[in-house]
């Protein structure tokens, strides 16, 4: 049975937190804390003010098994969060042991409420139960009326390192190991000092955050051939649900590589229930491009995590740049799933 809730219902918050905390399938962008920031940002984004939202909880015998946070735009239903930039992964929030039968029954009830509307599920990771369900049944007679399509959305890269640094380093290719040696020798030869700053929890250093967002915006402008980046900086720094989450969430992690006391590269994101950190932002300061700051940052971050006994893989999320694979990265995928209700 589907029951509709409002965002300010304490019962919804409690159900949401319980399902999310117990489920390692889900990414931090599905957490209640992150969704709160999205809701706050939505209030200042004109294009979202008139979008109708629906939050349904699917119950089986009075047991809540799945939350379906949705909004409607131009006669299409989307997962809430798709209308705000920032999230790398979206999903329904469900019991980790939810059965295929329950997912089907929830979709059947949703179809009764929104018959003739297209449901567009974007940024669904391959480990999601939703992806597994649709991949299993999308050509089955069970879902023939839904006209399900599954398309690749984005390639992501994750680094799962060994239990100690020597094992990790020797797991890399000979060419990658040689390149790492060369860049560290170059740093020493040119008297470039390096230091890794790690911020875990709410990011309270406003000056450092501004500095990081400045070169993040500059790098973005270089990539997009944009002449002016002032307004983009203001947006990223002060009017972004992602930045607000970085400033407020306990699960936040930022690794910032300093070269000669200046930020050379940083990656910022959130820990998950899956022994990993997902980084929606990974950026390098182009002023230090000759010193491979991305590789050095990843290398120093892995040393830090191993020294602190934190067995957390690094999901570098957006983009499949070559240096990520040189540092031991492997691909995983996000998908777009569409169906007719």
What feature does the model see in each segment?
Residues 2-79, 124-133, 137, 145-156, ...:
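A conserved beta-strand-loop-helix scaffold within acyl/acetyltransferase catalytic domains
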Residues 159-161, 338-341:
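Short beta-strand-to-coil "C-cap" segments at the C-terminal boundary of structured domains/repeats
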